[in-house]
Design a protein with these regions (language model features):
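N-terminal Rossmann-like or analogous alpha/beta NTP/dinucleotide-binding catalytic cores
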Residues: 2-117, 131, 272
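Structured secondary-structure scaffolds
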Residues: 2-47, 99-103, 156-294
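Short, mixed-charge, low-aromatic patches
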Residues: 28-38, 60-68, 124-130, 142-150, ...
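Positions that flank functional sites
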Residues: 51, 97, 126, 288-289
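Residue patterns forming the tRNA-binding/recognition surfaces of aminoacyl-tRNA synthetases
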Residues: 65-214
């Protein structure tokens, strides 16, 4: 029986330049890919850049550039950085590519037609840098727990994914598959999140406010929320749903991430997969932050 290994880094956000944290995760993924190739595994190593959303749009405006020109320039710097480090990836996915947009709209349509996406109004505390809403409980002294910056109170009409519907299933799946999320401390952190209602996930932004994104297939006045868009790179790069690469590699997926994006990968992504009828990834491997002397 053929041995198969699929390893991914997060796709890196292009609102800023490559940094040491990006390099650390990518070097670890490169090491794992090389080791598995040497051990006889058919191996696929994916990295890339996340190029839509409000933060990127604002960064392009601040730089005085067209958003597409801005993301082309910064994405190119990630590629050059990996070339300088000798990173031997098999594919570099960009969320502005047509192959990715096609898959995002396909999955959105599938989940929408199944009744798991609805329109509603939301008011909450929003971090522009994270591009996500937080509850009062999640804030640290009233600030974003990741960036330490003030959050904005926002109220707007969005489309929502029925994420709460899949919470009991996800709890059970994680409990029955103790090796899914590693190390164990992060698995326990996710189970603690799931012990309480997680609510539904806002998966769109009004195009009038955030014009830089993938339009919803049923409503051109809204673009796709950046996390619902970005997470699908792991299957769009494999030519989901019909590609030979998808059939071969997806059942063996190892995601490597930093702890700051644990919830999107351990809660958003599994529930999206379940709703779309896509099998779960094999492992989610979580690392901490690189800290300086201060």
């Amino acid at each position: 029986m053929e041995k198969v290994f699929y390893v991914t880094t997060p796709i890196y956000y292009v609102n800023a330049e490559p940094h040491l944290g990006h390099a650390y995760t990518t070097v670890v993924a490169d090491f794992l890919a090389r080791w598995h190739r040497l051990d006889g595994y058919r191996t696929f190593f994916l990295t890339g850049t996340d190029e839509h959303g409000e933060t990127v749009y604002r960064a392009a405006q601040a730089a005085g550039e067209d958003p597409k020109a801005f993301v082309d320039r910064v994405s190119g710097r990630f590629k050059r950085a990996w070339d300088l480090l000798g990173i031997a990836y098999d594919d570099f996915i960009r969320t502005t590519e047509e192959r990715h947009k096609k898959v995002v709209q396909l999955v959105l349509k599938k989940v929408y037609e199944a009744g798991d996406i609805y329109y509603g109004e939301y008011e909450g505390l929003y971090c522009v840098s994270c591009e996500r809403f937080y509850t009062e409980k999640e804030l640290v002294e009233g600030l974003c727990p990741i960036h330490g910056r003030p959050v904005e109170r926002r109220k707007e009409g969005n489309y929502f994914f029925r994420m709460e519907k899949y919470r009991p299933w996800l709890q059970e799946y994680i409990q029955e598959n103790p090796d899914l999320i590693r190390p164990e401390g992060y698995r326990n952190e996710v189970l603690a999140m799931l012990a309480e209602p997680i609510g539904d996930l806002s998966i769109s932004r009004p195009k009038s406010r955030v014009p830089w994104g993938i339009p919803l297939p049923w409503d051109e006045n809204h673009v796709t929320y950046v996390w619902f868009d970005a997470l699908l790179n792991y299957v769009s790069a494999l030519d989901y749903p019909e590609g030979e690469a998808y059939r071969t590699f997806w059942p063996h997926a190892w995601h490597l991430i930093g702890k700051d994006i644990l919830k999107p990968h351990a809660v958003f992504w599994p529930t999206m997969l379940k709703a779309a009828g896509i099998p779960m990834y094999r492992h989610l491997n979580v690392g901490g932050f690189l800290l300086g002397p201060d």
